[in-house]
């Protein structure tokens, strides 16, 4: 390489000399050439002297140094084309492959021959190889960039998807809640249609109607009743009221909390008051007589006055003046009173609106009829005036109950008995009627059917026949029925109150010979449901009874040792006396029977008495011990005069040591 | 007590007729469903407990007479059978402007209280005196056959199988229960039976080991009644609200 560069320099010099024609420059050139040749000769002389003087080791070091300098030069010249990474620090002399041409470009001779490129020089081969390698590296970098961008895009898509899923999850919760609210409304409608509505269903229907139709001329398809009637009819116990309060909260969530706020709060307060009443809690520090006076004070006052009174009471409670418990309790009662009064007034307003609508419709009908008769024009104005005056007078005097009667929906009787209507539909319509509606419908049916009998004049009857007075006849029948119902059986003789004649005789027979050691025994054992073939014809019932338990001391060895007459032992059951009354037994010739069965407690047994119709079986739980069955020991088993008597004592065991 | 069907809905095909290809036994399953409405019968009693009337209509749905509150049994819209013996003929004085009403009264077979009456002009109509009859619930007591049932829809399923020479027809009116539910219920019942048997066996062993215990002195009547009453288990607080 060095020789080639020297040749290059010489060629350049030769090229320059013919172009220069100046003599001065020629002289400078000659002098420079001479000086250069002199320096070279000196250097050559110095080298030869050093070579002569140096030792073998110095010679080896010099040569290594020279070679390394050459390698460094070559390395610098080929720095751009070097393929070995700089971290490896591999050189031609220092590499684990023992390859002295490591830094040179590999030449694949046979391939070049095959491709017809054997004429290329080393520089060209190196250049092509470098270009190919650079292109490959560039392509790899391009692929890496594409892969990274694709991964980043995928990650972005995943992030967006996750956000969308989160948002959708929140929406699904909301939709679930909305679905439940819709189902509540749907279930309410179904319960009302099927005639098994709850209090919350009726209240919500009333609230929705009163809210949606304040001035619309729409007649409701149900009977407008006072909301308090819904509460009384549906809610029977504390649990029902508590359920109602929760249901009201749920329904306000369905319809929106702001709708009918005052109305719902009033209903809730009344329900809470009913809960307190049924729980029989103490009403505070107010005496019972004062409560009546308080209620009278609240009456005959408008809602505004009551609200002012409430403010005054709140001020007194806050000011701690007087008896705080008294004012607190009074304030609670006042709130409930205001709620009830407000509900009543609201209902009155709704009814008056409905009445006005109905009257408008009636006026329209009258006008239509009058328009058909146009001839008597002169008579129309005075009639209208008279009607207006009458209506004004009626409106002032009417009460809420009268208004509700007028607003009451007229029932189409023909629809209920329509033969084309199928059975389920008819049954549903009948069941939807209230008590008053049912009464009206049945009276209308009687009138339509023309069931009234023909009446006879008093003159047409025979002279001596007995004529019953209407009221006297009714009274007589009622008395006989009550006497019949009075003899119905009760669960025990003690609760029968005033027994009748026959019962008193039976009672006397049963109580005969009662001693101080005996007490009335009335713990009846509950039997499973009994079914008899005759239960369709006769009303099954339980017989009445008067049973006694015989108690006394048991002077066994243990008790003789530890007790005496002054300090007696506890009494034990020594016997039973069952007296069961069967006054209405159909077949008096067959006596009742009894049987013993075991029960869970081995110390006790169940004795069961069985008789014929119309009496059901009756059972008692008795001590499980052996009976004495001899008459002289108190055993008695007889059925006489409608009284079944079973008396027995338990056996006593005595032994001698 | 359900009403009898007027039309014969059980047209059972002759199962031996082979409807398939001749020579080959064809298995044919025919599933048929028929819905009809069951109206229950209501039993009414006299105040003494004697059965007085069976009707397919509730008393409070019969036409009501304004004058005395009686109800009318009309043959065209009510089917009812009365159980009563003939009573006396009575002339009831209504208001002076109206006149006298002649009634043929019928009495209870047991206590002889008048329950029904008829008029000479229309013997096909029977009137029920007001407050004379009591329903099963009003009389009180328990009777499995007389609970006032609501009118309900009954689904009758008819399944016809025809397998050549053999065939079977299954008619079922079970209320909406399918075979799977029946099998599940039978399995549960068998489990219950096994549990009861095991319980009895354990109890028997317990009683056997009890022989060596010291026998207790029999207690008095008050303690026996107290033992019979037993202690009440504290009830778990129930969730409030019925809508959700």
Curated annotation (Swiss-Prot), chain A:
Residues 389-401 have a biased composition (Acidic residues). Residues 1-15, 61-72 have a biased composition (Basic residues). The keyword Cytoplasm applies. Residues 1-83, 369-406, 472-503 are annotated as: Disordered. Transmembrane segments: none annotated. One of its GO terms (molecular function) is RNA binding. Expressed in pharynx, intestine, vulva and spermatheca (at protein level). It is found in: Nucleus; Cytoplasm. Its main location: nucleus. GO terms for cellular component: cytoplasm; nucleus; spliceosomal complex. It holds the Pfam family Cactin_mid. Residues 26-60 have a biased composition (Basic and acidic residues). Residues 489-503 have a biased composition (Low complexity). The keyword Coiled coil applies. Residues 23-77, 352-403 form a coiled coil. It comes from the Eukaryota. GO terms for biological process: gonad development; mRNA cis splicing, via spliceosome; mRNA splicing, via spliceosome; positive regulation of cell migration; regulation of cell migration; regulation of gene expression; regulation of Wnt signaling pathway. Keywords: Coiled coil, Cytoplasm, Developmental protein, Nucleus. InterPro entries: Cactin_C, Cactin_central. Belongs to the CACTIN family. Plays a role in pre-mRNA splicing by facilitating excision of a subset of introns. Plays a role during early embryonic development. Required for the distal tip cell migration at the end of larval development and for gonad morphogenesis. This is Splicing factor Cactin. It comes from Caenorhabditis elegans. The gene is cacn-1.
């Amino acid at each position: 390489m060095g020789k080639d560069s020297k040749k290059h320099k010489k060629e350049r010099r030769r090229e320059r000399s013919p172009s220069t024609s100046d003599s001065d420059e020629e002289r400078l050139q000659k002098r420079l050439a001479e000086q250069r040749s002199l320096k070279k000769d000196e250097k050559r002389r110095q080298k030869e002297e050093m070579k002569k003087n140096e030792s073998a080791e110095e010679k080896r070091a010099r040569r290594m140094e020279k070679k390394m300098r050459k390698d460094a030069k070559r390395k610098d010249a080929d720095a751009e084309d070097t393929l070995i990474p700089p971290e490896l620090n591999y050189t031609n002399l220092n590499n684990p492959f023992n390859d002295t041409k490591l830094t040179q470009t590999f030449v694949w001779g046979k391939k070049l021959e095959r491709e017809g490129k054997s004429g290329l020089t080393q520089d060209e081969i190196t250049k092509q190889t470098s270009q190919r390698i650079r292109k490959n590296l560039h392509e790899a970098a391009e692929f890496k960039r594409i892969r990274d961008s694709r991964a980043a895009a995928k990650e972005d898509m995943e992030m967006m998807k996750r956000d969308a899923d989160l948002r959708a999850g929140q929406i699904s919760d909301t939709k679930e809640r909305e679905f439940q609210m819709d189902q509540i409304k749907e279930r309410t409608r179904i319960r009302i249609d099927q005639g098994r509505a709850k209090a919350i269903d009726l209240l919500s229907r009333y609230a929705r109607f009163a809210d949606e139709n304040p001035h619309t001329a729409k007649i409701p398809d149900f009977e407008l009743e006072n909301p308090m009637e819904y509460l009384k009819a549906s809610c029977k116990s504390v649990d029902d009221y508590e359920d109602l309060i929760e249901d009201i909260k749920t329904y306000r969530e369905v319809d929106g909390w702001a709708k009918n706020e005052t109305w719902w709060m009033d209903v809730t307060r009344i329900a809470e008051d009913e809960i307190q009443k049924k729980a029989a809690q103490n009403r505070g520090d107010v005496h019972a007589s004062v409560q009546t006076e308080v209620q009278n004070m609240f009456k005959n006052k408008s809602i505004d006055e009551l609200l002012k009174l409430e403010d005054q009471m709140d001020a007194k409670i806050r000011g701690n003046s007087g008896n705080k418990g008294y004012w607190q309790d009074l304030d609670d009662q006042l709130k409930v009173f205001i709620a009830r009064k407000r509900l009543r007034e609201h209902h009155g307003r709704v009814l008056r609106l409905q009445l006005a609508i109905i009257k408008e419709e009636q006026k329209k009908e009258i006008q239509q009829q009058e328009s058909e008769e146009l001839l008597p024009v002169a008579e129309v104005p005075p009639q209208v005036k008279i009607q207006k005056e009458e209506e004004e007078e009626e409106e002032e005097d009417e009460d809420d109950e009268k208004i509700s009667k007028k607003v009451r929906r007229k029932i189409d009787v023909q629809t209920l008995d329509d033969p084309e209507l199928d059975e389920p539909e008819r049954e549903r319509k009948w069941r939807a009627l209230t008590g008053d509606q049912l009464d009206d419908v049945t009276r209308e049916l009687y009138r339509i059917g023309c069931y009234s009998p023909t009446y006879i004049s008093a003159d047409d009857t025979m002279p001596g026949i007995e004529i019953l007075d209407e009221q006297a006849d009714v009274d007589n029948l009622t008395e006989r029925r009550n006497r019949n119902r009075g003899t119905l059986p009760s669960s025990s003789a003690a609760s029968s109150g005033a027994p009748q004649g026959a019962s008193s005789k039976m009672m006397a027979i049963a109580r005969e010979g009662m001693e101080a050691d005996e007490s009335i025994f009335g713990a009846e054992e509950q039997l499973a449901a009994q079914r008899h073939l005759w239960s369709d014809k006769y009303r099954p019932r339980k017989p009445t009874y008067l049973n006694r338990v015989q108690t006394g001391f048991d002077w066994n060895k243990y008790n003789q040792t530890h007790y005496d007459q002054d300090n007696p032992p506890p009494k034990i059951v020594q016997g039973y006396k069952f007296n069961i009354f069967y006054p209405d037994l159909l077949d008096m010739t067959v006596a009742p029977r009894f049987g013993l069965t075991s029960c869970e407690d081995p110390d006790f047994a169940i004795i069961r008495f069985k008789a014929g119709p119309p009496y059901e079986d009756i059972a008692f739980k008795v001590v499980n011990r052996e009976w004495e069955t001899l008459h002289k020991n108190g055993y008695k088993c007889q059925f006489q005069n409608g009284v079944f008597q079973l008396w027995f004592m338990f056996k006593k065991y005595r032994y001698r040591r | 007590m359900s009403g009898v069907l007027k039309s014969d809905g059980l047209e059972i095909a002759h199962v031996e007729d082979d409807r398939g290809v001749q020579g080959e036994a064809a298995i044919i399953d025919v599933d048929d469903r028929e819905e009809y409405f069951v109206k229950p019968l209501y039993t009414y009693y006299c105040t003494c407990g004697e059965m007085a009337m069976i009707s397919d209509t509730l008393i409070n749905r019969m036409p009501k007479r304004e004058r005395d509150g009686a109800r009318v049994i009309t043959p065209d819209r009510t089917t009812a059978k009365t159980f009563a013996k003939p009573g006396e003929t009575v002339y009831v004085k209504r208001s002076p402007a109206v006149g006298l009403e002649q009634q043929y009264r019928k009495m209870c077979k047991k206590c002889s209280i008048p329950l029904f009456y008829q008029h000479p002009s229309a013997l096909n109509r029977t009137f029920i005196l007001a407050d004379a009859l009591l329903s099963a619930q009003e009389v009180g007591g328990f009777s499995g056959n007389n609970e006032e049932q609501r009118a309900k829809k009954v689904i009758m399923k008819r399944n016809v199988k025809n397998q050549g020479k053999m065939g079977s027809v299954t008619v079922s009116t079970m209320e909406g229960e399918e075979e799977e539910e029946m099998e599940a219920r039978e399995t549960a019942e068998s489990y219950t039976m096994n549990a009861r048997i095991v319980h009895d066996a354990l109890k028997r062993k317990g009683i056997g080991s009890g022989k060596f215990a010291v026998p207790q002195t029999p207690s008095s009547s008050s303690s026996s009644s107290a033992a019979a009453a037993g202690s009440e288990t504290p009830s778990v607080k129930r969730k409030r609200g019925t809508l959700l």
